[in-house]
Swiss-Prot record:
Name of the protein in question: Large ribosomal subunit protein eL42
Keyword annotations from UniProtKB, A to Z: Antibiotic resistance, Cycloheximide resistance, Ribonucleoprotein, Ribosomal protein
Misc. comment: Confers resistance to cycloheximide, an inhibitor of polypeptide elongation.
One Gene Ontology term, aspect cellular component: ribosome
GO biological process: response to antibiotic; response to cycloheximide; translation
Matching InterPro entries: Ribosomal_eL44, Ribosomal_LSU_eL42, Ribosomal_zn-bd
Record carries keyword Aminoacyl-tRNA synthetase: no
Gene giving rise to this polypeptide: RPL44
Length: 106
């Protein structure tokens, strides 16, 4: 269980800052894949018509988790940077801090 606070003070690489500043933390989420990317256009063209599936579909998945990527936005200059964390099964953003001698909850 990884619990990350919603704000953190860390170094900002922005041209205005270049110092430690307060950052707003959010979790990175991949955007929607474009229909007009060259690979997708080529794949769709190859798939159209008769002949069934033309490229392999990957089945041998090895990993059970993904690396968590944090998106840090500087509160003063709005510069955004990304920070990759280690792999984890449970990730929480801005959850309650642990109390001593309390049972674990998921």
């Amino acid at each position: 269980m990884v619990n990350v606070p919603k704000t953190r003070k860390t170094y900002c690489k922005g041209k205005e800052c270049r110092k430690h500043a307060q950052h707003k933390v959010t979790q990175y989420k991949a955007g929607k894949a474009s229909l007009y990317a060259q690979g997708k256009r080529r794949y769709d063209r190859k798939q159209s018509g008769f002949g069934g599936q033309t490229k392999q579909i990957f089945h041998k998945k090895a990993k059970t988790t993904k690396k968590v990527v944090l998106r840090l936005e500087c509160m003063s200059c709005k510069t955004k940077t990304q920070l990759a964390l280690k792999r984890c099964k449970h990730f929480e953003l801005g959850g309650e801090k642990k109390q001593k001698g309390q049972a674990l909850q998921f």
